Curated annotation (Swiss-Prot):
GO terms for molecular function: histidine phosphotransfer kinase activity; protein histidine kinase binding. The keyword Chaperone does not apply. SUPFAM superfamilies: Histidine-containing phosphotransfer domain, HPT domain. Disruption phenotype: Dwarf, narrow leaf and small grain phenotypes. It comes from the Eukaryota. The lineage of its organism: Eukaryota, Viridiplantae, Streptophyta, Embryophyta, Tracheophyta. One of its GO terms (cellular component) is cytoplasm. The gene is PHP1. One of its GO terms (biological process) is phosphorelay signal transduction system. Residues 74-169 form the HPt domain. This is Pseudo histidine-containing phosphotransfer protein 1. It comes from Oryza sativa subsp. japonica (Rice).
């Protein structure tokens, strides 16, 4: 039991919302219903799933698919993949930065580098970063230097935020030990 965090389910707010009304009885019903049914509204989830909720919007379903590849034979698989992503993405961002300085208005070159970075983002499910890469590529297609520069700054910012969030995520999983392994419950 200690390996599970408990998370209130959407059903709670949905059911309680059914009883909202203007008179006192609706308040009594709402409170009574919740008091008598709260145990049914809790869903056990693994620690990793619970922690991933903090990364919602930064990661998409692809990250969960990467997690599904992790097993007892390779217990650090996801962390290793993410480490490789940050190493590779750092190199690609350095290449983009150099290209922006060395080759002003070479939109094809910029776009090629950003396409590689976007592919890396897609492979681990880094959705916010991928979206900023797409914005950069759109600006390249429009020949918009300022748009490219703005988008690249956003890419760098999203990269830094994602790195910090994932480092915290893996640190918490390591502290929890094997019990916090990235497994999702069968529903």
């Amino acid at each position: 039991m200690d390996r599970y965090a408990f998370l209130s389910f959407y059903k709670c707010t949905h059911q309680v919302g059914k009883f909202v009304g203007s008179d006192t009885w609706s308040n009594v019903l709402r409170e009574s219903w919740f008091f008598n049914n709260w145990k049914e509204l809790l869903v056990p989830v693994s620690l990793s799933t619970f922690l991933l909720l903090g990364l919602k919007g930064y990661l998409d379903e692809q990250f969960c698919q990467v997690e599904d590849l992790q097993d007892e034979a390779s217990p650090n698989f996801v962390e290793e993949v993410v480490t490789l992503f940050f190493k590779d993405s750092g190199r690609l961002m350095s290449n983009i930065e150099q290209a922006l300085e060395k080759y002003p208005r070479d939109f094809n070159r910029w776009d090629t580098y950003m396409q590689q970075l976007k592919g890396s983002c897609s492979s681990i499910g880094a959705s916010r970063m991928k979206n900023e890469c797409m914005s950069f590529r759109d600006s390249c297609g429009q020949g918009n230097v300022e748009g490219c520069m703005r988008s690249f700054q956003k890419v760098k910012r999203e990269h830094a935020v994602l790195r910090q969030k994932l480092e915290s995520y893996f640190q918490l999983l390591r502290q929890a030990g094997p019990a916090g392994a990235a497994t999702r419950p069968v529903m």
